[in-house]
């Protein structure tokens, strides 16, 4: 299994790359989220990879972050989702946006992606629930509500609450609330549960 490639980026043609690694050129497909963050051709690049071996081909898919690769792997486990569709999902939305859609069970958001119909979107939501750090999406939503959501969440976890409980409580904290006041409001919300 090829898990990582480091080399010189020779070609960039969305979504395909050619990376020279000690004289061997690897063709790698990447999601657009990775493509837009690549260095210029001729520069060094490090990609985390997922190798897929088929009867007729050995394919490499590359990612800049471990979260993207993990999400790609989770998508591949879903019936009816192949590598191309998984790549399309990651090209159409970030890992955080996907996690948030899963947390909110927002099928409409997924159906906007090319090749994803209503049934496929519902299957994605069902099978990804709790598997790709859905709390990441919830935290992103909570962060938009409160400037100090991460600090408040860390304090709640330090007090013995789970991240899931903390994220639910943070939703009750208005935007712009300070950390200490936010902790008080979150604790008040948790005491009502």
Curated annotation (Swiss-Prot):
A Gene Ontology cellular component where this protein is annotated is: cytoplasm
Region of interest (Domain II), ranges: 65-139
Region annotation (Domain III) ranges: 144-193
Subcellular location, record wording: Cytoplasm
The record's keywords, sorted A to Z, are: Cytoplasm, DNA damage, DNA recombination, DNA repair, DNA-binding
* Chain segments carrying region Domain I: 1-64
Query: Per its UniProt record, what InterPro entries does this chain match?
Result: DNA_helicase_Holl-junc_RuvA_I, Hlx-hairpin-Hlx_DNA-bd_motif, NA-bd_OB-fold, RuvA, RuvA_2-like, RuvA_C, RuvA_C_sf
The record's section on Gene3D superfamilies has: 5' to 3' exonuclease, C-terminal subdomain, DNA helicase RuvA subunit, C-terminal domain, Nucleic acid-binding proteins
Which portions of the sequence form the region Flexible linker?
A: 139-143
- Principal subcellular localization: cytoplasm
One GO BP on record is: DNA recombination
- Going by the entry's taxonomy, the superkingdom of the source organism is recorded as Bacteria
The UniProt record lists the keyword Zinc: no
In terms of SUPFAM superfamilies, this protein maps to: DNA helicase RuvA subunit, C-terminal domain, Nucleic acid-binding proteins, RuvA domain 2-like
Q: What molecular functions are annotated in GO for this chain? A: ATP binding; four-way junction DNA binding; four-way junction helicase activity
Family that this chain belongs to: Belongs to the RuvA family.
Question: What is the annotated role of this protein in its UniProt record?
Answer: The RuvA-RuvB-RuvC complex processes Holliday junction (HJ) DNA during genetic recombination and DNA repair, while the RuvA-RuvB complex plays an important role in the rescue of blocked DNA replication forks via replication fork reversal (RFR). RuvA specifically binds to HJ cruciform DNA, conferring on it an open structure. The RuvB hexamer acts as an ATP-dependent pump, pulling dsDNA into and through the RuvAB complex. HJ branch migration allows RuvC to scan DNA until it finds its consensus sequence, where it cleaves and resolves the cruciform DNA.
- NCBIfam families documented for this protein: ruvA
Looking up HAMAP family in the UniProt record yields: DNA_HJ_migration_RuvA
Q: What is known of its domains?
A: Has three domains with a flexible linker between the domains II and III and assumes an 'L' shape. Domain III is highly mobile and contacts RuvB.
Q: How does it assemble?
A: Homotetramer. Forms an RuvA(8)-RuvB(12)-Holliday junction (HJ) complex. HJ DNA is sandwiched between 2 RuvA tetramers; dsDNA enters through RuvA and exits via RuvB. An RuvB hexamer assembles on each DNA strand where it exits the tetramer. Each RuvB hexamer is contacted by two RuvA subunits (via domain III) on 2 adjacent RuvB subunits; this complex drives branch migration. In the full resolvosome a probable DNA-RuvA(4)-RuvB(12)-RuvC(2) complex forms which resolves the HJ.
This protein is called Holliday junction branch migration complex subunit RuvA
What is the organism field in this record?
Answer: Burkholderia ambifaria (strain MC40-6)
């Amino acid at each position: 299994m090829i898990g990582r490639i480091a080399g010189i980026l020779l070609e960039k043609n969305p979504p395909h790359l050619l990376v020279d690694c000690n004289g061997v050129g690897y063709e790698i497909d990447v999601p657009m989220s990775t493509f837009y963050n690549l260095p210029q051709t001729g520069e060094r690049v490090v990609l985390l990879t997922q190798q897929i071996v088929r009867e007729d081909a050995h394919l490499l898919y590359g990612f800049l972050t471990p979260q993207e690769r993990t999400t790609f792997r989770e998508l591949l486990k879903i019936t009816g989702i192949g590598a191309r569709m998984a790549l399309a999902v990651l090209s159409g939305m970030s890992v955080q946006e996907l996690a948030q859609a899963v947390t909110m069970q927002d099928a409409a958001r997924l159906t906007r992606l090319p090749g994803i119909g209503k049934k496929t979107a519902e299957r994605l939501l069902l099978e990804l629930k709790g598997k790709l750090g859905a709390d990441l999406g919830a935290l992103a939503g909570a962060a938009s509500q409160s400037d100090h959501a991460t600090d408040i969440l860390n304090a709640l976890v330090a007090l013995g609450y789970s991240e899931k409980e903390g994220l639910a409580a943070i939703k009750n904290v208005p935007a712009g609330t300070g950390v200490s006041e936010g902790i008080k409001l979150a604790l008040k919300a948790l005491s009502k549960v």
